[in-house]
C-alpha cells in the first residue's frame, strides 16, 4: 500500500487562500444561528501556514473486515501557523437583552443606544501536535484525536476581553477536537466517497475547488490501476518485509537498524528495542560513549534480554564522570513514570540521605579509612533488608563523594558515583551531600511503549 | 393612536392623582413621541367597550400573513373612572394620540398651601386634599391579555399602596417560546422626587431610577416675575445580574413657556456615561397646529452622530366652527368641562408660590368689608405702586393661558406626523384622524436606498456598461421603498 502526499498543494500560497475562503464561508454560514452580539459578518483577514503540515504514520493496519479499508495511527504536526479574524460586536449588552424580552415587561431605558466595537483576534504561532486514530471505511473517514497538544498565542484588540476569550477558547478546544473536527472530517469524506468523480456543485465559483477535491479523492481508495503507479522502492521494501516474515528467521533483515520501516517495530527486533529502553545502562549505551576495553560491563550485556540485565551503571561511566547526579535522577524518574502507568500523579519516593560530616578526630587521620566509614554510615541509615550495598573502595576519589545509588530493591547493585566536584572546596565549606535513590519498584509492573510523552529512543 | 387599554391606564392615573410627568422613563417622552412614533405594520382593528363602570374589554384583530389577535380585560376599582374615559366619537384627538407633553410645574404643596387657600378654584385644593387625605382608599387595576393563536399571556397589576407609593407588576408568559418574564416596579412619588425600584426576571435585571424636580425659584436674571419653567434632573442605574451588564444614564430637562407668545418648549440633554452617548433634544409647540422637534445624537467614543427631525401638523375643523362653538355643550360635554376647569387649575399651578395670588387678592379686597379704611388705602397704594409689574405678570399669564385655551378648545380632525433621521435615511409618515367615530391611523416608513444601490452599481461597473445604465435608470425611478405600511382602526363605546 502506498500513499502519495502532494506537497505542491501546500507549496504555494493558494493553500492559505483556500483555507481563508473555506473558513470565512463556514463562519458566516446562514444555517448557523447568528449571535445577537455580532453586528457584522466574521471576516477572515489572514491565514498563514508557512510550513507544510507534517503527517507521520506510526502504525498502519489493513483489516480484512468487509467494509473497512485501513486503520492507522498518525501523528499530525503543524507549526508557526497564523490566523486573524475580524468582526464587529455590540458592547451594550443591555440593549441585546432589551431586544430579547417582550417590550411589555421591559422597562424603557433612556439613551440606551447601540455601541459597536470592531474586534480583531489574532492567533499567532499556533503549534499543533496530535496523535490520531484513522479509520478508513467505505462511507467515510473516521478520525479520533487522542493526544492533542495545541498551543497558540492569542492577541485581541480589546484588551479587557482578552483573558476571558482566551480562557473560553481553551475550554472549548476540547470539544472541537473531540466532537467538531471528527464529525466535520467524516461529513466531508462522505462527500468524497459518494460523489466521486462527478462535480455536482451548482455554485460556479466553487466548481474548480470541488473538482480538486474529487480528484484527490481518487487516491483514497485503491483501484487496480493504482498498483501500477506505486513506487518501485516501496514495492521492494514491502517485498523484503514479506520475505523476512516468510522465512521465520529470528534475525532481522537489516542489521543496523531496529526496523525496516521507520516507526514500526517487528517482533524479531523486540529485544533490541527492550535493550534500549531507558534504564541506566541503556541510557548509557545509547550515548555514543567510547567503551573502554577494560570495562566491567561487557558489550554482551547490552544485548542481553531485559529480564537478565540489571539496571545499573558501569563503573567506567562513573569513573569517567560522564553522568552527573541530575542525569541519573532524570533517568530514574523516567523509569518510574514508565512502570507506574496507572496513576500519573504518583511521585517517585526518593530516599534522601544527608551525609553531614560529623567528623570525629579519628576520621581525619587517613583518606582510606574515612571512605570506609562513610559508606558504612550510609548503610546504617538506609537500613532496608533487601538492599545489599557493596561498597568498593577507590583510592582516588574524595571521601564523601563516594556514594551508592539504589534503584530497585531487587536489582540493586550499588555503584559508586564519583562526582566531578572540587574536593578542596567542598572540604573547606563542608557542604552536605544529598543521596538520592529510588525504591520499592516492582519489576513486574507493565511497561508501556509507544505514544507516550517520551517515546523510546529507537530512531 | 393610543391603544384603548393605555387610555384606561391614563384615566386610572388621573383618577388616583398619580402624576406621570414625574417618571424618569417619560423624561424624554415629548421627543420620543415626535420622533419615534409607532407605525402600524398591518391592517389592524380594535374594538373596545366599557361594559361596566369598572370593567373594560378590548378585542384586537390584525392581518399580516394570517389573522391573529388578542383579547384583553381590565378591572379597576377606581372611582370616577368613567369621568376620564370617553368613547372614540367623543374623545378629542389630542387626547387620543401621543403628542407634545405639556408639563405642569410642580409646587411644593406644604409651602403653597397658604396661597392656594385663597384661590377661588378648588381643583388644586381637591388634589391636595386627596393626596394628604387620611382616608386614602387603596386603588388597584388588574389587566390581562391573551393572544391567539400563539396563546401568549400578558398580565399587569397596579396597586396604589399609599398616597405616595405605587406598586406595579407586569408579566408575560409565552407557551411556545417557554418565556416567562416578570417585572416589578415600586414607585415612590414625593412630588419633588420620584424614585423607582425595578426588578425583572429576564437577565435578573435590577434597576433604580430617580427624578428630581428643582423648585422653580425666581432667579435674579429672570426678568419675568411670572415663573413658569421647570427644571428636572434624573438618572437611572441598571445591572443585569446574569450577564453582568451594567447600564446608566442621566438626563436634564428644562421646560418653559415663551414669554411673548406663551408657547411651550422643552429641552432635554441626556448622557450615557458608559457608552458615551450624548443626545440633546429641542421640542417646541410653534403654534396651535404645529409642533417641531430636533434631536442630535453624538457619541463621545466613536464620534458617530445623528440628526433627527420630527414635526406634527394639526388640522382644525374650519367650517362649522361657529356652530360648533354654539353646540359645544352638546357635542363635547367633557371637553367643555375641561376647558372650564383646566385653564384655571393651570393658572394656579403655574403661579409660583412666592408670588402672592394677586388676581384673587384684588378680587377679595372689595368683598372683604371688615378691612379698615386706612389699611384699604395702603393696599390700594401698594397695588398702584406695583401695578406695572402686576400687569406684566397678568399679561404673561394671560398669554400662556390664552394659548392653552386655544389648544384645548380647538377641535382637531386629523394630524400629520413626519419624522426623519439623517443616519438611518428613513422617513416616517403617519396620518391620524377621526372619521365617523373611528380613530384611524395610517402610516408608512420609507427607507432611502440610494446609497445601497450606488454601491451595488459600483460593483457591477466591472462587469459591463449596460448594467450601469440599467441600474441608473432604476435608481432614478425608485430611490425609496416602503419598509412598513399599515392602517389601524379603533372603535370604542
Swiss-Prot record, chain A:
It comes from the Eukaryota. Residues 1-190 form the SMP-LTD domain. Keywords: Lipid transport, Lipid-binding, Membrane, Mitochondrion, Mitochondrion outer membrane, Transmembrane, Transmembrane beta strand, Transport, Ubl conjugation. CDD domains: SMP_Mdm34 (cd21673). One of its GO terms (molecular function) is lipid binding. One of its GO terms (cellular component) is mitochondria-associated endoplasmic reticulum membrane contact site. Residues 338-375 are annotated as: Disordered. Residues 348-359 have a biased composition (Basic residues). It is a multi-pass membrane protein. PANTHER family: MITOCHONDRIAL DISTRIBUTION AND MORPHOLOGY PROTEIN 34. Present with 377 molecules/cell in log phase SD medium. Belongs to the MDM34 family. This is Mitochondrial distribution and morphology protein 34. It comes from Saccharomyces cerevisiae (strain ATCC 204508 / S288c).
Curated annotation (Swiss-Prot), chain B:
The keyword Membrane applies. Its main location: mitochondrion. It comes from the Eukaryota. GO terms for biological process: establishment of mitochondrion localization; mitochondrial genome maintenance; mitochondrial outer membrane translocase complex assembly; mitochondrion-endoplasmic reticulum membrane tethering; phospholipid transport; protein insertion into mitochondrial outer membrane. Keywords: Membrane, Mitochondrion, Mitochondrion outer membrane, Transmembrane, Transmembrane beta strand. It holds the Pfam family MDM10. The keyword Mitochondrion applies. GO terms for cellular component: ERMES complex; SAM complex. It is found in: Mitochondrion outer membrane. It is a multi-pass membrane protein. InterPro entries: Mdm10 (IPR027539). Component of the ER-mitochondria encounter structure (ERMES) or MDM complex, composed of MMM1, MDM10, MDM12 and MDM34. Associates with the mitochondrial outer membrane sorting assembly machinery SAM(core) complex, which consists of SAM35, SAM37 and SAM50, to form a SAM(holo) complex. HAMAP family: Mdm10. Lacks alpha-helical transmembrane segments, suggesting that it resides in the membrane via beta-sheet conformations similar to those predicted for other outer membrane proteins and porin. Component of the ERMES/MDM complex, which serves as a molecular tether to connect the endoplasmic reticulum and mitochondria. Components of this complex are involved in the control of mitochondrial shape and protein biogenesis and may function in phospholipid exchange. MDM10 is involved in the late assembly steps of the general translocase of the mitochondrial outer membrane (TOM complex). Functions in the TOM40-specific route of the assembly of outer membrane beta-barrel proteins, including the association of TOM40 with the receptor TOM22 and small TOM proteins. Belongs to the MDM10 family. This is Mitochondrial distribution and morphology protein 10. It comes from Saccharomyces cerevisiae (strain YJM789).
